[in-house]
Amino acid sequence: RNSGPLLLLCCLPGEFHEIGMLFFALAAVDRWYRVLLLGANMTLDQIPEVIEQQPCEAIILSGSARPARGLFQDALPQLVRNTSIPVFVGGGVAERNRETIENAGAICAGKDIKPALGIIDKTLSAAA
């Protein structure tokens, strides 16, 4: 059984492509992370309540499609403000929206799994 940090994983609102997130979850577990997988099409305003019930060390949001209007300008900054843990955005949507994601206070993890895990490792190590 893994004893590493617990990561909350879910797809962005309107995102139904879970395969990349599932591959990421497998790679994270292989690196001794624990994973709380919420699945596709998750509204971001529900995440703080989940974190209250099951404390996690980071939130990982996944997306490959075009983000919903206002997602990175409104909902993402609100999530960052309403949680005290790092919020990462990964997948193709992250590559195309890096500046907007970072302006929202989240961390762009990119679309490739191994480098994304490196970014998460480094961020969580610095916070410890």
PLM feature segments, named:
Residues 1-54, 58-75:
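Conserved binding/catalytic microenvironments
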Residues 86-92:
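Short beta-strand elements of ligand-binding domains
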Residues 83-85, 106:
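A short helix->loop->beta-strand "cap" motif at the edges of active sites that frequently abuts
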Residues 92-128:
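Peripheral docking tails and interdomain loops at the edges
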Residues 27, 79, 100:
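Hydrophobic/aromatic ligand-binding patch that stacks against planar heteroaromatic rings
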Residues 70, 85, 125:
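Short glycine/threonine-rich loop/turn motifs
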